[in-house]
């Protein structure tokens, strides 16, 4: 059986934690920032976990994560 290919776009966007969960960055932090509050921008800077309903799809895209 051949090796599975990794979706490189997904591999750049996700990282695994030590316990095996998947981390991601939040959206809406790249431009149009001047009307957003400092608190909102600060919260958007933090990483969060991929929701369990999407986790299986991410794992299929990154088989060796």
From Swiss-Prot:
Residues 1-28 are annotated as: Disordered. The keyword Ribonucleoprotein applies. One of its GO terms (molecular function) is structural constituent of ribosome. It comes from the Bacteria. InterPro entries: Ribosomal_bL35, Ribosomal_bL35-like, Ribosomal_bL35_CS, Ribosomal_bL35_sf. GO terms for cellular component: cytosolic large ribosomal subunit. Keywords: Ribonucleoprotein, Ribosomal protein. One of its GO terms (biological process) is translation. The keyword Ribonucleoprotein applies. SUPFAM superfamilies: L35p-like (SSF143034). PANTHER family: 54S RIBOSOMAL PROTEIN BL35M, LARGE RIBOSOMAL SUBUNIT PROTEIN BL35M. Belongs to the bacterial ribosomal protein bL35 family. This is Large ribosomal subunit protein bL35. It comes from Trichodesmium erythraeum (strain IMS101).
């Amino acid at each position: 059986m051949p090796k599975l290919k990794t979706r490189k776009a997904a591999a750049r966007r996700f990282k695994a934690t030590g316990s095996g969960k998947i981390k991601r960055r939040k959206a809406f932090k790249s431009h149009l920032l001047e009307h957003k509050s400092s608190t909102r921008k600060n919260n958007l800077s933090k990483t969060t976990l991929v929701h369990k309903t999407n986790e299986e799809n991410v794992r299929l895209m990154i088989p060796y994560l």
